[in-house]
Amino acid sequence: MVDYILLVISTALINNFVLVKFLGLCPFMGVSKKVETAIGMGMATTFVLTLASLSAYLVERFILIPLDAQFLRTLVFILVIAVIVQLTEMIVHKTSPTLYRLLGIYLPLITTNCAVLGVALLNVNLSNNLIESVLYGFGAAVGFSLVLVLFAALRERLAAADVPRPFQGASIALITAGLMSLAFMGFTGLVKL
């Protein structure tokens, strides 16, 4: 049980997919202008990443390995992720039309979020069992959501700040992301496996 908790903490804080592995940078930079949008995107990504990890494990274990079709892994995982994203899009559209409108194009773009595919492929490469796969996906999603919301809050503060002209826009956003990455390096050594 403790190992599972440490896996989630390690994946969310120490080996954060955005700040350490540089996966999921497109939504990180694109959706992080308002905290409300970042929270919605974080919740949708958490749902998709967790389900994608579960589905990828099941597809790998019960379809690809028995059929000796591991060479189709990437293609099949992309199809599975696309189905899960469509399901998520329908759920968000029905439950929160405002959030659906705010997320706009970024919701269907979860399909091409490299963090989602990266987690699914890393689960296979790390030979995680079912529970570890789901927790790894959940931890990655929690880390992604945490960083997304924190970055959105910082960008809202920066929008009201007097930033020098050469640093306005993407420049200050990248500098802020770099400082966040340095801050998250402080978690290194928190979990010893």
From Swiss-Prot:
Membrane topology: Multi-pass membrane protein
EC number(s) recorded for this UniProt protein: 7.-.-.-
Record InterPro entries: Ion_transpt_RnfA/RsxA, NqrDE/RnfAE, NqrDE/RnfAE_oxidrdctase
UniProt keyword terms in alphabetical order: Cell inner membrane, Cell membrane, Electron transport, Membrane, Translocase, Transmembrane, Transmembrane helix, Transport
One Gene Ontology term, aspect cellular component: plasma membrane
Record localization: Cell inner membrane
Entry superkingdom: Bacteria
GO biological process: electron transport chain
Record bears the keyword Transmembrane helix: yes
Pfam families attached to this UniProt entry: Rnf-Nqr
Claim: Amino-acid biosynthesis is one of the keywords in the record: no
The protein's role, per its UniProt record: Part of a membrane-bound complex that couples electron transfer with translocation of ions across the membrane.
Protein family according to the UniProt entry: Belongs to the NqrDE/RnfAE family.
Name of the protein in question: Ion-translocating oxidoreductase complex subunit A
Native source species: Haemophilus ducreyi (strain 35000HP / ATCC 700724)
